[in-house]
Amino acid sequence: MSIYRLNRLFNPESGRALDVAVDHGFFGERSFLTGIENMAAVVHALVAANPDAVQLTLGHARLLQAVRGKHKPALVLRSDVANVYGNPLDEHLFSHHVPNAIEEAVRLDAVAICANLMQLPGRPEIREANIRSIMALRAEATTYAMPLMIEPLVMQDNAAGGGYMVDGDTDKIMTLVRQARELGADLIKADPRMMSRTITR
């Protein structure tokens, strides 16, 4: 992991990082696009708001990195895609990472890459796919000194809607956070309110 990249991610005064994710189009769900239809305008607004980082996909990362000047948010690159958010769900679920995600992150001058670690009821194959992706990304991230951010997501059945919703069970999330660290996460992406509870337990 490169401390030099992390120096561009974390606020030097607070030691914290606000990473605004607008990578939702990657997952192929129409409902995720509300408010982010015009990505050039979205990125322009975020640069003006000046969070610590903006999380983008391969297709839109250049919108941020094309902005001139020193004072702009850092780039966190989304490295994986899945179809587990549908309502109703597709018959076949998948989760894959971009094969050359680390090299792309280096070329795009990202400060970190982000990958999911998901727990879905009755779908252990998705967690297995995530773990395979994380292990592959970890090996290449080490070679290029690219910080690896893992986003633990615990989901619950949405029986009425036919899909999954986020499960706020702290014990389940804590288990995934621990597993993410054991798999080599340099960074954990989470709601700060939930994170304080999982870290202190």
Write out the residue ranges for each language-model feature:
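N-terminal basic/disordered segments at the start of proteins
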Residues: 1-12, 18
